[in-house]
Amino acid sequence: MNEPQFLYLTTLGWKTGKKHRIEIWYVKRNRNYYVISEVGASAHWVRNICHNPNISFSVNGLNFVGLARIVNPMKETRLAAEVSELMKVKYKWDQGLIVELKSLDFDERQLRS
């Protein structure tokens, strides 16, 4: 497996406004990246996203600016199942709240190439 184990996600603290950076397992599906909060919505970084979905993240030396959102497994059953399966294959684990990270740079970069 050539893919890195972690990505680095930066959110803005909803109380402090300060940058909060974490190292977290991830998978990529199509153009988006997905991470899972083991403790659900109580994780500080998830709370930050709920208050302000603007994020930045880096993976494998590439930096992105984007938006994050919580995946609703009841309404997005196929997406949730596919992300869970990708996490199981990569990490042998898939339990928790799925969060989608969408790069706002992707389409612009593709047009330039």
Task: Identify the residue ranges that each predicted region occupies.
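Short, structured beta-strand-loop surface elements
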Residues: 40-112
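Short beta-strand segments
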Residues: 4-38, 55
